[in-house]
Amino acid sequence: MEGAEPRARPERLAEAETRAADGGRLVEVQLSGGAPWGFTLKGGREHGEPLVITKIEEGSKAAAVDKLLAGDEIVGINDIGLSGFRQEAICLVKGSHKTLKLVVKRRSELGWRPHSWHATKFSDSHPELAASPFTSTSGCPSWSGRHHASSSSHDLSSSWEQTNLQRTLDHFSSLGSVDSLDHPSSRLSVAKSNSSIDHLGSHSKRDSAYGSFSTSSSTPDHTLSKADTSSAENILYTVGLWEAPRQGGRQAQAAGDPQGSEEKLSCFPPRVPGDSGKGPRPEYNAEPKLAAPGRSNFGPVWYVPDKKKAPSSPPPPPPPLRSDSFAATKSHEKAQGPVFSEAAAAQHFTALAQAQPRGDRRPELTDRPWRSAHPGSLGKGSGGPGCPQEAHADGSWPPSKDGASSRLQASLSSSDVRFPQSPHSGRHPPLYSDHSPLCADSLGQEPGAASFQNDSPPQVRGLSSCDQKLGSGWQGPRPCVQGDLQAAQLWAGCWPSDTALGALESLPPPTVGQSPRHHLPQPEGPPDARETGRCYPLDKGAEGCSAGAQEPPRASRAEKASQRLAASITWADGESSRICPQETPLLHSLTQEGKRRPESSPEDSATRPPPFDAHVGKPTRRSDRFATTLRNEIQMHRAKLQKSRSTVALTAAGEAEDGTGRWRAGLGGGTQEGPLAGTYKDHLKEAQARVLRATSFKRRDLDPNPGDLYPESLEHRMGDPDTVPHFWEAGLAQPPSSTSGGPHPPRIGGRRRFTAEQKLKSYSEPEKMNEVGLTRGYSPHQHPRTSEDTVGTFADRWKFFEETSKPVPQRPAQKQALHGIPRDKPERPRTAGRTCEGTEPWSRTTSLGDSLNAHSAAEKAGTSDLPRRLGTFAEYQASWKEQRKPLEARSSGRCHSADDILDVSLDPQERPQHVHGRSRSSPSTDHYKQEASVELRRQAGDPGEPREELPSAVRAEEGQSTPRQADAQCREGSPGSQQHPPSQKAPNPPTFSELSHCRGAPELPREGRGRAGTLPRDYRYSEESTPADLGPRAQSPGSPLHARGQDSWPVSSALLSKRPAPQRPPPPKREPRRYRATDGAPADAPVGVLGRPFPTPSPASLDVYVARLSLSHSPSVFSSAQPQDTPKATVCERGSQHVSGDASRPLPEALLPPKQQHLRLQTATMETSRSPSPQFAPQKLTDKPPLLIQDEDSTRIERVMDNNTTVKMVPIKIVHSESQPEKESRQSLACPAEPPALPHGLEKDQIKTLSTSEQFYSRFCLYTRQGAEPEAPHRAQPAEPQPLGTQVPPEKDRCTSPPGLSYMKAKEKTVEDLKSEELAREIVGKDKSLADILDPSVKIKTTMDLMEGIFPKDEHLLEEAQQRRKLLPKIPSPRSTEERKEEPSVPAAVSLATNSTYYSTSAPKAELLIKMKDLQEQQEHEEDSGSDLDHDLSVKKQELIESISRKLQVLREARESLLEDVQANTVLGAEVEAIVKGVCKPSEFDKFRMFIGDLDKVVNLLLSLSGRLARVENALNNLDDGASPGDRQSLLEKQRVLIQQHEDAKELKENLDRRERIVFDILANYLSEESLADYEHFVKMKSALIIEQRELEDKIHLGEEQLKCLLDSLQPERGK
């Protein structure tokens, strides 16, 4: 096919081919066998680059076809010409199932490095760097090559982005797959966000689902970061950057420092420009290597062309190294990515230009230092010392034609970790990792300067003056220099390049080279620089070098600690003799730096709080050796440091305050250089002293104190944004004594430290980064220290999480009051945060502080470390399992999610039982809530407004609170703040919230909170706001009341978990009316329903739910549920469904204890059941669908269908295979279920619940045929997604295995289910070989199980989306479902449309599992009754085989139907995209498109990781007691790594959810309700369909395995 012209293809394909023909020949490749195809795509029009196949997986289908080569540009897929967008290509590829036809354009030279190349190859392939962009991963020249390869070398913005993406992909896929497990915790943790994504991606590559595209999907779309640096990939990339700055200092990472990064880049690029293409990059890379070494290989991967030529395309954010850095990345990304991308890029280049002159001048001054130190550094870096040397030699980086690369290098140097830029980075990793050698070399040859130069050639410029000043001062460890440079760059980004340069010029040289990495936090460090406001980035870098002592402490807590140790020890001794380069190279280098820093400004260094050890930990992960050495050394001196820190922190606090004023002044007069330079030096000295002594590099995860300390600082900061800078300086330095460091922004122009929440939020809501930093930063950190402000704000939230007693409203209000910021405060915090960019890092720090505060609370609770770790998703899961105090769980989880990711390796059990705060505050949940609100708004303008108000309030609140807390607040806190629209309801809902917080939260933390996190705002709103606001409406609809009644307790749970229920506007009035009309009878049912739903799910689950409800807000819930339950019920139906889904999502079944899982599932089921209509709940209870209800339901359903017919929906066909009895039962049930002819709005609610009609019969089926019948409900469910709530858990369980039915059983554990399980057990008992597969009691974890807590249950998403899209028309009737039941092979287009593919998939899967169970049960029964057990067993097996075969057929049909749904959704997405593109600004459209692309990637990544993790966990569970410890340990390690990665992916999902909300908000301003509903549906269905597809595949696979096992088991018997 090669060389052959493609056959006639669509015009676009022809065009694509024509384009392809330009640079090479077209090759047609035919792949077959289905996904994964085994190749990774990069670039795309989104990235301004060709869509290139960057990697061909060995042994993959793509590899099987020799014609497909890495570097091929995809021109057409399946005869469809590509428009050039990667997402399009991915969709097409994913849409290809059996065969994939690719038309690729092959150039004589490939511009892409195969993904197979590993980071190690980056260094190995240094010579290759110039040859290919991927090669350039380790070498700057390669970037140029990549630039030309992918785009003009000048179009670095896209080129680096794409190339970076490519590199990232390459790095991710290859390095991730190779290194992810190899460097499970340290590297993953450090580069966790990106690295774990990489690893995840790579792992996922292994995973079939994620394999072909998981890498591409997981690959950070840095390239996308052009448009949206907050994209998952960008976040990843940025996280790397953040990580580097975090290592160097989070402040350098401050998103508020968009220019900081740019200026860093600009400062660095000045050096780089001259030789950036050739020398600077290598040299620069050498420098970045230092930072990169931790990521040694990652660095290069993240190395991105400078894009100096493309100011508009700022360098991609560094890959997230860790949750923290991920959060920081988001923040940084926001500033560096978006701002950097646009304004920052220009500024950066301007700054670069400015910096260059200064750099040139400085180079003259630092000329010698650079030359003297740089040569050695370059030599070390071996990163093309020649090139950078020259630049360094001048002290300025001659603008090279590869200025972009140089700039990139500059940014890399600033965030070496994120972009270890030189081929040397490969070497540097060792240098950095060794850090001792690095430092030794640096020290020996004044590597400080050399290192600094090498590490951040661009900074060298900005640091040139500093260099001049620093002279030998640059001798500081190169890593430190990097950190400082990074910090400087970040600061430069924050500060005008002039300022940065000026500050750098004024910066004391010694510090600059000394603690660059550590300087990232430097904001406090260089008060003068801050005052100067211009070179603070350089201050951060140069000053970081000069005042490096400060910076290093910030940049790398370990280094800072080391520096402090050195400062304390060495400074105290006046020598680093105690710290020997041989014994403690890192500490020695740090000490060297510290000495220099003290020279520069011990005070400042003290002022600069060292970044948390997490920073060090991250660098550590990048360079385990360095981290280990440093950590060991630091730990050795930790006690001393802590002592010093406590002492110095107090001192530094005061000093920091002084510095703060200066910083403020600096901020105000950011251009001051000379005086500020001196003052800055003084401050640096003071800050350095404080930082080194007061702040320790201790990792938060290692030492909870830092959190406490930081919270103190945060308190101060929170107290006074202006003082925040001091607080940042003093606070970090002063963390021990929060009093001294008044509220100092972590750094005014610098990177603020955000909590994981804040970081996540910053990622998802870059525009709120400042807000995140300030509002939440203040609150979170203050809470621990200044309980007044902190408690009021973040502390309150924490307390809320801990006590869950504070009403959510209080929290938002308190936060506002404490902050003294109105709800608008989020805006103000943003302003303040941006004004005090330091605050933003502080926000991170605050978040960290929050985490730490949470830890402190946890510590108080006796689980300080654990709460922090809850931050990780695994921890969240663990926390769900543990069900720790809601406060700690959620706050700590949210705050610590990023940090905890590092701690993922820690036993989740180690972590306190936390409510899945993330899930609770799941961005998607919030988003969905918001969307639901929007939907409701659309549906009912009146309710919609409150809903809108709530979401806005939520967003505002979120802006104030840390991202997760914000989410939690949105769910929990926003009820109060967002209850304002539904203030009327708010009283009751707040009561619910309060009750939930006070009572239910503790119990509901898992479920309720999880639900809250996952529940759509609609639910929350309906739960809380609906009661009062919708009180009339809600109350008027009897059915809604029922639904609420049914849902009320679930809603209560949901409300408990989702105090923000009010966020979701009450169901549209029309909905309540419909409910009134249709649910008049159900209105009475609410009470009964409440009673019934509880019994229905299961006594235990009901009890739990009721208890939670009663605890949380049973009175309110019941009272409001019954009187207000109608709308509430409607909303609650959604809420319940969402709650159940959310509960499932927040509390992955696998994560929760079986009982809890069952309860949750039951609750979900019950909620779902309740949602439909109380009547049905009783029916369920009775297990007999009321005929009258059936009639009503049919009418209602019909109405709903009719109403929904108006809904625009993508046809979703779900093939349900069920027995005729099931069909009949379900039909009859469906009739009762149908009665929920809710008001149109309510229909949507019901649709969301989808249980309204279907769940009813689903319930009925489930209850009537609980054992096997659940399948029928699922089948019925096609018409109603809500049954999926019930189904989904069963599906998941089924996915898990027929025991999946256990899941349903857990929900509805009926006698039949128990019988089925018993029979299955009997069969298993007879044939142990089938135990794993057939034993109902065997819980097989599936991808869906692990995905459960991540995504709001797809059913809910689909329901909401479908509701929005009004898919109910396809639900037209359970009859349709019944017909489908009758014709399982026929896609249940109508009902399935309602259910969406997800439901269809769920139904087939459920049917398959149910049938299997039925057969098993039958077989088991036969066995019981049969005298010949063996014969009976064989017969039963045969029956089971037949049933499974039928189910498999149904599942396959469902898969085909799902494909149709996917295609339909893709079409819808294309339509939506076209609309969005037409109405939205390009930047907004880019955000939309990147979000969509990231959504696909994140979902696939999560699926892949979930699948892999499920397999590992299953393997662990299946390990025999006699299994070798080595095997178990290996699996445990894999599990740990996968859990970390999974948690990282979850954070990505949270970020994605926040981005989704952002995009939704953007689109809401442009799109009509219908279009917006289509968008919501598309987005939700996109992920739901992907998940559903994966679930179907898993179920099919399970069924096939079951069949195989059964057949195999029968053969021996036959042989007998």
UniProtKB/Swiss-Prot annotation:
Abundant in retina and melanoma; also in brain, placenta, lung, kidney and pancreas. The keyword Cell membrane applies. Residues 150-159, 247-259, 343-356, 405-415 have a biased composition (Low complexity). InterPro entries: ASD1_dom, ASD2_dom, PDZ, PDZ_sf, Shroom_fam. One of its GO terms (cellular component) is plasma membrane. The ASD1 domain mediates F-actin binding. This is Protein Shroom2. It comes from Homo sapiens (Human).
